[in-house]
Amino acid sequence: YDVAGHKEAAKRGLPKLRDSVSAFPVMTDKKNVDVFKKFKVLSKTEVASREHIFVEKYIKQVTIEAETAALMARTLILPAAIRQQTELSEAVAATEAADVSTSTIRTQLEQHVELVNKFNEAIEALEAAGEAHHEDVHKHAKHIRDHVLPAMNELRDLADALEARISADLWPLPSYREM
């Protein structure tokens, strides 16, 4: 929503819930449970059960997305980035052998290597964030929101940067241009 929408919500006394993890517990607020009970829609236990199911579904869905992102990054994008790095390295060597200045291509190689290293670190960070588990589903959901989602976003940003640098013939996925 735009700023006007947030202002209108505040004016009406509506809660400012930025994400699902913040919204889930509101389901079981007494005033909400009372409305469900009053109109015989759901009992307190049923509301709590539904809220628990929503939290578990969120955890499962984001976990699958994170595992898929890490797998694609490690098995598709990283190998393509390494092949691009190899091609750049060979170009530097061939240019040096021809006794021609390599400053431009060497800079490209150095920037690419730095990006590949950051990308690999981001894969490891996402995998590490995904390994943490909490018995309490609400704590686990908060961990996912606060650690796994930011790690996925960082990995995505780096993958986008690599896509812009890697030759189209090496890139293993449909590009934005192709979609």
What feature does the model see in each segment?
Residues 1-179:
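C-terminal amphipathic alpha-helical interaction region
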